[in-house]
């Protein structure tokens, strides 16, 4: 790594090699050549003077790009597309006259952008499916383990560790559905010309409108898409970038919510993210086990969520058939949204596949609060024995306030059970109260809800996407 120039943290620290390649110059320029081949093939099939020999020559040099020639040419003409047209022509002298025939720069530029987003979304989808599988395994393993629930981060009715995980999982499932929808509806720009009218192609096809329409269909098919935009200016609608980045923003929201929950749970010492044997949590405090991966998820997630505003502003600021104030912004914002989301999902998979659960801490915290939550059950049991509901309610209120003071003022343990057992109005014993205080009696349908959700919603997704399961993620720091 160079140390005397700026290096993007996405390359050095966060994004995977796979995502970095998708947004590399090599992927871009090889896609340009694939698009030029698709254009030549379609024009040949529609009767233009493009020979099979020329197409074969283009295909022979689809991968071995002469970058040195393109770079030198760009110094002269200051135009990246025409520089690569020239370089391709140097390698393909027979095909040189028909390279880029009828097209504008946006033919390769915009279509490549859509193809790149598709490839990046497919990688995101793969990692999202693996994240779903990881959390599903955790939820199933701990679906029956009662834990204290929190609303407003204050003690609330118990749930289970696994049921809580299904909340993270539900978010990911919604993200998966959105990714699938976006992938299914992506369209290429096609071959639209300088203002979207296909005027140059109409001229090439001697006024044959059907051939112009067929050209778009053929290009879409050859590049693996269902369709091209039916209408456009010079570029595809920049709203598409917003749709894609919003989709990534949804994933960031889900991962950030998970990371926040986990950081709080780690503070409570109930669940921790993985911690390597030789990992150092703090340069000053050697005992520290900081949730650095979860914190990084939160940090990168904020970036992705805010970054989604860039394509929104860009789409809203385009004038008529096009302006170029989109280019510099989208070159950075869309790519980095994918690089960051890729890094987030790698961290998410890494963390969820190695979560450390502390059952005794979870049980102790639950039991410290459960007596308060069980007072309704205790009161009803006493009423069945002949007690006065109103009198018992007041006594429970008084005992609860006193027990709460012991915990919060004196720093003692919750003695509510002892207080109620000692009060003759309740006609009960400590043993009878403890029999009521079984955590599994207070979790409602949490275990069943978890099992149903996994069986009915998650498992069908994992079965459908079984070929995507199994991904090795590497966390650089």
Predicted regions mapped to residue ranges:
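Long, amphipathic alpha-helical stalk/connector segments used for oligomerization, subunit docking
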Residues: 303-389, 395-398
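Short, well-ordered beta-strand elements within core beta-sheets of diverse protein domains
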Residues: 163, 242-250, 377-385
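Glycine-rich anion/phosphate-binding loop at the beta-strand->alpha-helix junction
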Residues: 175, 179, 226, 233-327, ...
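Alpha-helical transition-metal enzyme core signature, strongest for iron centers
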Residues: 78-81, 128-135, 139, 165-179, ...
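Active/binding-pocket-proximal capping segment
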Residues: 272, 395-402
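Short beta-alpha connecting loops at secondary-structure transitions
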Residues: 20-24, 69-71, 279-299, 321-336, ...
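A helix-coil-helix interface module used to build multimeric assemblies
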Residues: 1-199, 205-220, 281-282, 292-296, ...
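Glycine-rich cofactor-pocket loops
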Residues: 140-162, 272-288, 321-328, 353-373
